[in-house]
Amino acid sequence: MLIFSMLNDKRTRENRMMSEQREDLGFDPDALRAKYREERDKRVREDANEQYIEVKGDFSHYIDDPYLDAALEREPLTDEVDVVVIGGGFGGLLSAARLREAGVERLRVIEKGGDFGGTWYWNRYPGAACDVESYIYLPLCEELGFVPKEKYTHAPEILAHSRAIAEKYDLYSNACLQTEVTGMEWLEDESRWLITTNRNDAMKSRFVVMSNGPLNRPKLPGIEGIDSFKGHTFHTSRWDYDYTGGSSEGGLDGLKDKVVGIIGTGATAVQCVPHLGESAKQLYVFQRTPSSIDVRDNTQTDPDWAKALKPGWQKARMENFNTLVSGGLADEDLVNDGWTEIIRNLLTMVNFSEAKLNPLEIAQKLELADFQKMEDIRARAQEIVDDPSTAESLKPYYRQFCKRPCFHDGYLPTFNRPSVELIDTQGKGVDKITEKGIVANGKEYELDCLIFATGFEVGTEYTRRAGYDLIGKGGVTLSEKWQDGIKTLHGMHSRGFPNVFIIQNAQSAFTVNFPHAMDEQAKHLSYIVDQCLGSNIQTVEATAEAEDAWVQEIVKLARLGQQFQESCTPGYYNNEGKPNLRTVQNGPYGAGANAFFALIKGWREEGSMEGLELN
């Protein structure tokens, strides 16, 4: 989002106080800047993303599927289809749905889970819910004649909706569930991809859509002694209800006599900690960096409102939301929630429509608006949490978009329970894990159960996160080509890997409503596949010139926000506090999602498939 690239322009360091009036603000901007730097610096680690452990080998049980009733038995496949879609989450479902709408019949989805749903198949922890309004987050609602039950619906309904999409578009009939891709090789003589799997499949496909998902591979912290704990342990994305009891709605009765520790205080922990606090005999929450916690105010869907929706309602609502959170203007705020309020507050401070401000003054006012909002977030923690020390530890000191903002009405009150204790590590993380529990701040906390709410790999190699590599033209692998940074056209095509389409945020659109971007990419790739199938085009790939130009454009635009990311507290947005040229190149399209959507739509309408080499 371009609006945030201005928040830390170099020029804001010059004469910052030109338009600041401390007596009117209620806070000291210089003091906050110093506090933000102090909090950031204590959290920066030299090992950045290397601080995390790859979940394999002795740690592979953390990614076992706990939701399978029985393992699926089938014979290996050696057939051929027109399109293979790798991944059964929203990106894969949308790609397959749009391909079906384009008339593609010989299509197969390969999914490692036991069903469709992607992140919503795996993340069934108590309290799991979408943090973007469900009426725009759940894809293809109009196509299915469906309206979610809540403004921010919970995981069971999202998973059920995923299954309904697969049913509507007949994706189960030829799907390979409980199947992991192990490799892909381009067969030059046949113009086909050979796809191998852990079930000894060796199938061929003319086109491949890679939709592995941005948050699909759990990560573990590289804490000393992580493999020594003798109690029960699991990752939140593989919640063990056999141990905890209860369901995604809570009621974790199995923990009533258990002392539980949870490492992590990001978006997942914010949703599940209230249920753990309600059920566990004792809960210790180990925190490195607090999340910003704003009001959620979830509501049930009004049946009369749902019945009155007119054709095109979801598309209009999605586009309206994306315009507003990208800093654009609209006559009406259809979603009108915490996300759009953030941007509305920023724009109100700047008042673009009336004030004649230069870029320096705009940057200053945006920064002040951000300060004010985060002051409100910190005041909310102070107001809700009874213990002053705990309240202070729960206050985030960084710009609001340094980390994904959280919205929840039950997280902060949980720390008023006598059985819940926040263990703030002052940015250092826990010291070590022992046979009995966790050592933090020099003190050992004995536990019966240890839960990792430590998120997913984001900044690691794409092929590592995917779990397989591609061998393209001339025997070059994708990992070799991308070793110094991602190289694509529109984030989707990479030269040397014909007929492959990649659904991702990198070098593509980023919006807080991920499925919207995925759908625009799905429409784009389905158009190209349809053109190829209808015109007997055997191969399609980016030209070298178009790919180079796109990478240069990505880097140029990304530099607008680089100063902002460098000032942020460590997280997956900024390579754990170590942004570099590679992370800049691997970033999204810096002009914003709306500009990207318009760009690829215009590309399709122009009709010449510029930048692609067709054979």
Place the predicted regions along the sequence by residue.
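Active-site-adjacent "gating/activation" loops or surface patches in catalytic cores
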Residues: 230-238
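N-terminal FAD-binding dinucleotide-binding subdomain shared by FAD-dependent oxidases/monooxygenases
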Residues: 8-10, 15-83, 100-227, 242, ...
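Hydrophobic/aromatic ligand-binding patch that stacks against planar heteroaromatic rings
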Residues: 275
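Alpha/beta-hydrolase fold nucleophile elbow
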Residues: 260
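Glycine-rich Rossmann-fold phosphate-binding loop(s) that bind the pyrophosphate
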Residues: 87-91, 265-266
